[in-house]
Design a protein with these regions (language model features):
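A basic, amphipathic helix-loop patch mediating RNA/tRNA/ribosome contacts
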Residues: 1-48, 82-83
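Conserved S-adenosyl-L-methionine
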Residues: 96-104
Length: 272
């Protein structure tokens, strides 16, 4: 099965429109199986290795595209706010926050030396590397957090929400990447750490909703990430609002979102 290169870029989150995809291809930064391809209509195998080299996606990493989608579908903006990027890595989410008006971003990650140099040297960024979010307390910060994102691996959201509850403003909002491979029981995770069953995705999202509500967050929106994980995992974006009276998502929304995700992404190639 083959697919047009520009269509592939759109489906996998490299570009937000066909025109943007064509521009990337024509600029000479798109490589298929290590070979530069400059024709948007080039037909490629669905399992081909596709790379967009350079920062022409607009952010230091493709992670920024996940937050970009969240801001398109949920009523959340970082303009003028103190923000936190939990699981910052190279800083795609941080970059997206700054691009959209954040006044300060605390970039938190257990790793070291990963944050892009352009962000490391930006006076609006507080680089909290070598920091486990589970150990962060309000007195470690100079501010309350009004806008946050979560993109972490090998840790469940049940460990994130209790901390967010203590460091956020009363009206804070956030978007959490729900990764089934790190939430589901081991018996439900397949080869290479991939969760494929819609029933497991549904179960995980109900669990994530419970974690949020138990820590004073209302799950106020849900969608699927435009980018699959490296091994092909479908991941989800959950929009939350800090609240003393948390409410669940509308009935049936979790099931519908899972169905929409599988319809859109089951045949999409994995991200490389």
């Amino acid at each position: 099965m083959k697919i047009r290169l520009d269509q592939y870029l759109c489906q996998n989150g490299y570009a937000q429109s066909r025109e943007r995809a064509k521009a990337l291809i024509m600029s000479g930064i798109v490589f298929v199986n290590e070979q530069k391809v400059d024709k948007a209509g080039e037909m490629i195998a669905e399992d081909a290795k596709v790379e967009v080299r350079g920062h022409d996606i607009g952010y230091v990493s493709r992670g920024g595209l996940k937050l970009e989608k969240a801001m398109q579908v949920f009523p959340m903006r970082p303009d003028g706010k103190v923000c936190m990027d939990i699981g910052a890595s190279t800083g795609g989410f941080t970059d997206c926050m700054l691009t959209n008006g954040a006044v300060k971003v605390y970039a938190v990650d257990v790793g070291y030396g990963q944050l892009a140099w352009s962000l490391r040297t930006d006076e609006r960024v507080v680089n909290m590397e070598r920091t486990n979010i589970r150990n962060v307390t309000p007195d470690m910060l100079g501010d309350k957090i009004a806008f946050f994102s979560v993109d972490v691996s090998f840790i469940s959201l049940k460990h994130i929400f209790p901390v967010a509850d203590t460091i956020c403003t009363p009206d804070a909002v956030g978007v959490c990447l729900v990764k089934p491979q790190f939430e589901a029981g081991r018996e439900k995770v397949g080869k290479k750490g991939v969760v494929r069953e819609p029933a497991t995705h549904t179960e995980v999202l109900h669990m994530a909703q419970g974690y949020a509500m138990a820590n004073h967050f209302t799950p106020a929106g849900l969608d699927f990430s435009p980018i699959k994980g490296p091994e092909g995992n479908i991941e989800f974006l959950m929009y939350v609002q800090h609240s003393q009276n948390p409410q669940p998502l509308p009935e049936g929304l979790i099931e519908q979102t899972v169905a929409n995700a599988h319809a859109a992404l089951d045949k999409a190639p994995n991200l490389h």
